[in-house]
């Protein structure tokens, strides 16, 4: 019997599919990645081809093993993490999608959402699903597909069609259609799932006219769902034993499994999640209530705040403003000046997300005087990422009544030392940057490994969560509050910029 030395994490993201091999010490042995096409049929619409998602993801799995020179029988288990909310409907018999995947960013269901608001469902949806009414979530996307593909609703009622988020689709394909399953974290992003009863919500299914027959079974984030053969029939059967949506996987990968622990992922946007333990905290401050993973993958709750523009505002400095050649240059130029010279940049290019939720806000630069140069603007843009994070954190502390002691960070922008130091300064809190930056894949691997006994419990992993660097606040409270007050003033003036009819 070959020794099972490794765990594979499949990380199916918005722009690429990745596979990561990890050993028992949580070291990354090899990584394989393939990008796939973004389809934009109309302005504001975003789709993916589900067959291409499957093709890229399955090929990275084969590639990553070949790269590491590892045979399939050395793999103890596979964990899956995925872009959340993205919606796929396919034929049970053939495994063929009846429409492209409708991606989380897609805004085509705005009108359905307006109807839900007009029907007075906001409070029901917030109380029972933990979400706000927005095209972001899967429910209205499923309705759209059933409304627009002829005969599909009847076929779904007859049990001929299946719905799934990306995790469900991948497992269906990996098990040759034997297993139709999702986990609590992904289900909590559909707007069809009751986060208190932990079951599909009959009222939401009725409102959106979605047949229950097409929905997957919902399971814990860490258990064996089925087996997959790597290398076709007769190949080694490997358990698939971990599933979590990408942000929840990152929370678990950062080992934020105790009440009050939080992480912030700095990507295109920012996603901050705080574990609230066994209490589902209803937000009064513009956050989402969502499901997270406890220490053994059981149901915990979390508060989540999404900021639309983080890394994207650095890309704007590079691509549109041409102030830098490379995102990495932003740190160099920002540190060429002592401060922003009174300038604030509000990067509300597509409106503002949490905690404001103002689609009519637009980007702005305030406080310009004759002495302001490009470096001040670069610095102010970086600072805006930290200010927006404080906005979300203040909302979290108000909702949860928990004071944060340290913020764990991950994502591309955490390599920027200036930003991380300023983040600590403006929060007045320690910022902890981990050694391993691949925390989303780590989370999926941990969930899978725990389910099959590859790791006994999280205590084994605690020492693996090495903090590479800790940033501590370096400014006085009065200075911090003065700067943050300036930011609040700037945001207020950027809000409701686009005229709209009441």
Swiss-Prot record:
Positions bound to ADP: 14, 18, 268, 311, 412, 416
Keywords in alphabetical order: Allosteric enzyme, ATP-binding, Glycerol metabolism, Kinase, Metal-binding, Nucleotide-binding, Transferase, Zinc
InterPro entries linked to this entry: ATPase_NBD, Carb_kinase_FGGY, Carb_kinase_FGGY_CS, FGGY_C, FGGY_N, Glycerol_kin
Single GO MF descriptor: glycerol kinase activity
Residue positions binding glycerol: 84-85, 136, 246-247
Xref: Pfam families: FGGY_C, FGGY_N
EC number: 2.7.1.30
Amino acids binding ATP: 14-16, 268, 311, 315, 412
Pathway: Polyol metabolism; glycerol degradation via glycerol kinase pathway; sn-glycerol 3-phosphate from glycerol: step 1/1
PANTHER family assigned: GLYCEROL KINASE, SUGAR KINASE
UniProt cross-references to HAMAP family, sorted A to Z: Glycerol_kin
Record family assignment: Belongs to the FGGY kinase family.
Described function: Key enzyme in the regulation of glycerol uptake and metabolism. Catalyzes the phosphorylation of glycerol to yield sn-glycerol 3-phosphate.
Protein name: Glycerol kinase
Organism field: Escherichia coli O7:K1 (strain IAI39 / ExPEC)
Lineage, opening ranks: Bacteria, Pseudomonadati, Pseudomonadota, Gammaproteobacteria, Enterobacterales
